[in-house]
Design a protein with these regions (language model features):
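Phosphate/ribose-recognition catalytic cores of enzymes acting on nucleotide-derived substrates
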Residues: 88-211
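Classical nucleotidyltransferase
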Residues: 1-98, 124, 179-183
Length: 211
């Protein structure tokens, strides 16, 4: 595809890069291929930060283990994905924390560790901060994984079936099973306060938020 569609004069590849069926293509294969097709090849070494190699594998592990800030730093951008707003149980609204239930568009979407996150969503070009819970909602005895976000500011109507972009900025805490709904609401208020403090920093700019 690369050769047919782009006719490259030079290919830049990482030293440990693999590709193709069952990752059978490696740098040695690429060297032979480029030589036979009169294409220049530049092999670059690993990018490091404090002797730690920055790689896609490491970034995936960071996301899956909840180290979102570090993952975003290594990505050089904010980890996020597209999701469709789907119908939920309506419980959040009863708790005075209405949420939009999200279904990732990609079937095999990489998802973060279960927990509560400070997020930013792009909805019809509008940027809205919020707090997101990814988990099974153990307080209510449920077992299905649910991704839901409470957006700060005025409640947005008619979000169902909309496609939004959701970014994970900070991990706030683990998902907890509370002994009562009142205890859950009390914690949600603390989470919101925490997220609003972070929101103020992010509104000053991404660099300020990481200091």
């Amino acid at each position: 595809i690369l050769i047919k569609n782009f006719n490259p004069e030079c290919i830049v590849s990482g030293k440990n890069h693999t590709f193709g069926h069952n990752r059978s293509g490696d740098i040695n294969y690429l060297k032979k291929f480029c030589t036979n097709n009169n294409i220049a090849l530049e092999v670059v070494g690993p990018l490091k930060d404090c002797e730690m190699v920055i790689s896609s594998t490491n970034i995936r592990n960071l996301i899956e283990n909840g180290f979102i800030r570090r993952a975003n730093y290594e990505l050089g951008s904010i980890y996020g994905f597209y999701a469709k707003v789907v119908s939920g149980s309506g419980r959040g609204k009863k708790l005075k924390y209405p949420t939009a239930n999200l279904m990732p568009l990609e079937k095999d979407q990489l998802l973060p560790k279960i927990g509560v996150y400070f997020t930013r969503c792009i909805i019809n070009g509008l940027s809205r901060y919020g707090m997101c819970n990814f988990g099974i909602r153990p307080t209510f005895g449920e077992n299905d994984l649910v991704l839901e976000v409470h957006l700060f500011g005025e409640e947005l109507n008619d979000l169902y079936d909309n496609c939004i972009w959701v970014e994970f900025l900070e991990r706030i805490r683990d998902e907890i099973k509370f002994s009562s709904v009142e205890e859950l609401i009390e914690q949600l208020e603390k989470d919101k306060s925490n997220c609003l403090s972070l929101k103020s920093k992010y509104e000053l700019g991404e660099e300020d938020a990481y200091n």
